[in-house]
Every structure is written in structure tokens, then in C-alpha cells.
């Protein structure tokens, strides 16, 4: 009998101190700073993803409805459907990009800073500019690849514009993306050679998915260049970016994370009102290319 009743003091302690079960009707989890409510189509409703930001992002789009036209398609049909879905977005001026990046790339641990793409360094938002020690606007799809410059359109599309250290941005220049080369001393984990740049592992997938977006959004029918991915480096001023086979591998090696989802949501809700399909559905890259 003594062995069977060993738990009674513990039960009594619960009744004395009081205990309340988590309420299912409360909506957000108790520790809301660890989660974002992101637009993911699931049979059971919204899926919660780990998130370092203190902000709780509410789904602004039912992605199943948003991508309805693309459902069941693959190859060129899928690419064309996605192009129609994400075209017609709100275009920013190049000066408006500064403030947009201060929100989309805000450091979740310090709201006064942004996270730089290639170094993942946190730097003051006020340090945007063109001097050593500043950060500027990196065109992941190099603007010389298609010569679209910084006019409203591909040159100001924040789905591929990211904060980067001025010197690192200059070192990357207009190189295509590939594996290999020498490590760039001011950005450990990044490698480069004569015609290509390899970003650090943490952002390889981010880079790939930004380039996939650009190749789908800009198809040449709306006054902008027809941007396409190929399996080459050294593309120069042609409207191409490589290296496609490597980008497809990076898309798998570095899966979509909560920071990308949060960024996609902010761009959709607050700025351009279109989404990057390859953040919502990274598997579509293999279905198209």
C-alpha cells in the first residue's frame, strides 16, 4: 500500500499551489517570441515555426488560394503560371529600398540593426551608405546582368535586394554564383575566384531562391529584360545568372528558414504585395528547372 500511494504528496502539492493547463483558445503559444504565424497551407491550419524575432507575424495570405493558378502544373506551364501570379507588384523607388531593407532584414535581437547578407553581421541601420564600414543595397541578381540598373522594377525589387557590407558587396561585384575559390578575408565562409562567388552555407539557399524568383518574375513581356538562369559563370552583361545546377543543390542544402518566411511575409504585406513562390514552395525549383 505504501508503494502505491507514493504519488499522493505530489498531487496534493498541485492542488495547494494551483495549476492551470495551457488554454487551447488562447491562440498564440505562451512563449510568443519564439514563433511566427506564417502562411502555410496545411490540413490542420496554421503551422508555427521557430522564430527569433519578438514580433508575431500573422498570415496575410492563404497560399493555397494565392497559388491556385499554379496547382497541378510543372515545367514551363508552372513557370508561366507563377509569373502571372507574382507580376503587377507595387514597385519601389531606389531610395525607398533603404527603409524597406531596414524592416525586412532587421536584426531580431536588436531592432536598431540589420543583418548583412554575406557576413550575417549585425550592423546599425543608421550605417547605410557608401563608405567603408557602411552597408549598402546588394543586388543578388547583379544589375549588370541584363543592364536594368536601379530604375523601378528589377533594380528595386526587394525580393532580391539585401543589406551587405560595402566592401564585401564590391568584392562580389557582378559575379555569378558557384562553388570554390579562395576565402574572402572580410567575409569568412565566402569564397570567390575570377568569375564566381560562393556565399556562406547559412545563406546559400536564400541566394538560390532569390534568383529563382527573379527568373520567373521577369520574363521580358513588360518592358523589363527576360532574366534567365543558365549553367554557366562569367555571363557578363547578358540577362543570365548561373550556375543553375549549383543553385538547385543549394536550395536543398540550405532549406527555407523562419527568417526567410518572415521576410517574404513583410514584403507581401507592407511593400510589394507579391510573394517569392520558392520560399513558400521550394520544391517548385526542381519542377521548373
Curated annotation (Swiss-Prot):
Q: Could you say which residues form the signal peptide?
A: 1-24
| Catalytic activity, EC | 3.1.-.-
Residue span of region Disordered: 177-197
Query: Pro-segment residues?
Result: 25-51
Superkingdom in the source lineage? Bacteria
* UniProt entry keywords in alphabetical sequence: Hydrolase, Nuclease, Secreted, Signal
Principal location: secreted
Q: Which GO MF terms are attached to this record?
A: nuclease activity
Q: Per the record, GO CC terms?
A: extracellular region
Is Secreted there in the keyword field?
Answer: yes
Where does the record place it? Secreted
Annotated function? Mg(2+)-activated ribonuclease which hydrolyzes RNA apparently nonspecifically into oligonucleotides with 5'-terminal phosphate.
Designated name of the protein: Extracellular ribonuclease
This chain's source organism reads: Bacillus amyloliquefaciens (Bacillus velezensis)
Give the gene name: bsn
Amino acid at each position: 500500500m505504501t508503494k502505491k500511494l507514493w504519488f499522493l504528496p505530489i498531487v496534493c502539492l498541485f492542488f495547494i499551489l494551483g495549476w492551470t493547463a495551457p488554454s487551447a483558445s488562447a491562440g498564440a503559444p505562451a512563449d510568443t517570441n519564439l514563433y511566427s504565424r506564417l502562411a502555410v497551407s496545411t490540413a490542420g491550419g496554421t503551422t508555427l515555426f521557430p522564430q527569433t524575432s519578438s514580433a508575431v507575424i500573422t498570415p496575410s495570405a492563404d497560399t493555397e488560394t494565392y497559388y491556385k493558378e499554379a496547382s497541378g502544373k510543372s515545367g514551363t506551364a508552372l513557370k508561366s503560371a507563377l509569373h502571372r501570379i507574382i507580376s503587377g507588384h507595387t514597385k519601389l523607388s531606389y531610395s525607398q529600398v533603404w527603409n524597406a531593407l531596414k524592416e525586412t532584414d532587421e536584426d531580431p535581437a536588436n531592432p536598431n540593426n540589420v543583418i548583412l547578407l554575406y557576413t550575417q553581421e549585425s550592423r546599425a541601420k543608421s550605417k547605410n551608405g557608401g563608405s567603408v564600414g557602411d552597408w549598402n543595397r546588394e543586388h543578388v541578381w547583379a544589375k549588370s546582368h541584363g543592364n536594368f540598373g536601379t530604375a523601378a522594377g528589377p533594380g528595386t525589387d526587394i525580393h532580391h535586394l539585401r543589406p551587405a557590407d560595402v566592401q564585401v558587396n564590391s568584392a562580389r561585384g557582378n559575379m555569378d554564383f558557384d562553388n570554390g575559390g579562395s576565402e574572402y578575408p572580410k567575409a569568412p565562409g565566402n569564397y570567390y575566384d575570377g568569375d564566381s562567388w560562393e556565399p556562406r552555407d547559412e545563406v546559400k539557399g536564400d541566394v538560390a531562391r532569390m534568383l529563382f524568383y527573379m527568373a520567373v518574375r521577369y520574363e521580358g513581356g513588360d518592358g523589363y529584360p527576360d532574366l534567365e538562369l543558365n549553367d554557366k559563370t562569367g555571363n557578363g552583361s547578358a540577362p543570365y545568372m548561373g550556375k543553375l545546377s549549383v543553385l538547385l543543390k543549394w536550395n536543398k542544402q540550405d532549406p527555407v528558414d523562419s527568417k526567410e518566411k518572415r521576410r517574404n511575409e513583410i514584403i507581401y504585406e507592407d511593400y510589394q504585395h507579391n510573394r517569392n513562390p520558392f520560399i513558400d514552395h521550394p520544391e517548385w525549383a526542381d519542377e521548373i528547372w
